[in-house]
């Protein structure tokens, strides 16, 4: 890892005063953002830190409203040093409050926000509602037939050219949606082995076509600076490992992880969740790059898990802790830097004291500053 310069150390030191000394702003209504509380120099340092090489902090944010008496439902309430947030639900038809909330965090804090939903088949999530509302009167035999016709999915699936054109049309529409709302990229939730199957994810070749089209506009091959992430089961795309070149990060749902050995297995040599990421992508991308791209995440949907920092976890030296802390302390056994850590339903941790206590601690563990980010 490159050494963080004095600028970044200053940024992280300033975070202490904001999180600990000026934490009252987190109780404000979302309509009163804290632009006046911190200096331009602080925010410049914060944005510079996020451009540096480091293990990132990530989260899926749900129940977003952008307003309310408390900031649990606002992006502005997320700790400043979180790098990437995937919007889980409530991502369309943005209100003025949501737009203001999103733009403040993007432009001032430098946080990047990705649209996220489960990918199964062509049309998922973005087929116009009128297609579903009018299929009978238009003479289709089923709702699915109407959806397929809208996207150009052929009745004869042996027509590979038509299949590819349909997939690319759908992927292009997702990019248009991202640009419409001003998100910073897309997080593909890919979980075909957990009941989320369809004509894209059932076939590695179709999945490759889908990602290739996205990759023209998102991810490291696009040159746009926009993000392309894949979460869920990226290790399962075994027949097309070259797909890995299109992604910025692999986000692994290492929920209720028992310890370092579990994380090493998910990354390196496989286990109960299938092959390790390196088994799938190592030859194509190299072991170091795969490791640098890997973000391990814990599930905070359960209130107890959010309040406590996850589940019991034991590191390779026999030390016991909670799982989010364990993920932050985890050093992959291959010796390379991990991509980072994160939480699902990160907003559920807002009720800790200070807010997002466990995620802040994880950030401090991975990227220590000269001062603690929170009071222990």
Model-based region annotation:
Residues 1-9:
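Bacterial N-terminal signal peptides that target proteins for export
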Residues 17-21:
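C-terminal motif of bacterial Sec signal peptides marking the signal peptidase cleavage site
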Residues 22-376:
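Secreted glycan hydrolases and related glycan-binding modules that recognize and/or cleave
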């Amino acid at each position: 890892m490159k050494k963080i310069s004095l600028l970044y150390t200053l940024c992280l030191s300033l975070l202490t005063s904001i999180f600990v000394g000026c934490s009252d702003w987190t109780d404000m209504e979302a309509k009163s953002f804290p632009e006046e509380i911190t200096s331009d120099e602080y925010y410049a340092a914060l944005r510079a830190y996020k451009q540096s090489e480091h293990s990132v902090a990530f989260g899926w944010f749900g129940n977003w409203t952008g307003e309310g008496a408390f900031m649990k439902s606002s992006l502005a309430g997320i700790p400043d040093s979180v790098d990437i947030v995937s919007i889980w639900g409530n991502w369309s038809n943005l209100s003025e409050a949501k737009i203001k909330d999103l733009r403040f965090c993007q432009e001032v804090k430098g946080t990047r926000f990705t649209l996220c939903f489960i990918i199964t088949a062509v049309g998922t999530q973005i087929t116009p509602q009128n297609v579903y509302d009018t299929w009978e009167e238009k003479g289709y035999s089923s709702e699915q037939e109407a959806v397929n016709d809208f996207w150009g999915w052929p009745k004869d699936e042996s027509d590979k050219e038509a299949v590819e054109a349909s997939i690319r049309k759908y992927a292009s529409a997702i990019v248009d949606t991202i640009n419409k709302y001003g998100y910073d990229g897309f997080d593909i939730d890919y979980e075909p082995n957990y009941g989320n199957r369809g004509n894209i994810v059932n076939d590695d070749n179709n999945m490759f076509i889908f990602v290739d089209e996205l990759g023209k506009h998102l991810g490291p091959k696009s040159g746009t600076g926009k993000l392309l992430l894949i979460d869920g089961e990226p290790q399962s795309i075994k027949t097309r490992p070259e797909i890995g070149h299109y992604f910025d990060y692999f986000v692994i749902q290492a929920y209720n992880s028992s310890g370092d050995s579990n994380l090493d297995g998910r990354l390196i040599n496989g286990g109960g969740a299938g092959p390790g990421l390196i088994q799938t992508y190592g030859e194509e991308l190299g072991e170091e790059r795969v490791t640098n791209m890997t973000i391990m995440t814990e599930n905070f949907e359960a209130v107890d898990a959010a309040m406590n920092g996850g589940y019991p976890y034991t590191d390779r030296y026999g030390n016991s802790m909670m799982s989010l802390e364990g993920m932050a302390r985890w050093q992959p056994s291959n010796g390379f830097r991990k991509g980072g850590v994160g939480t699902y339903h990160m907003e559920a941790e807002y009720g800790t004291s200070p807010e997002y206590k466990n995620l802040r601690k994880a950030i401090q563990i991975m990227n220590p500053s000269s001062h603690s980010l929170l009071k222990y």
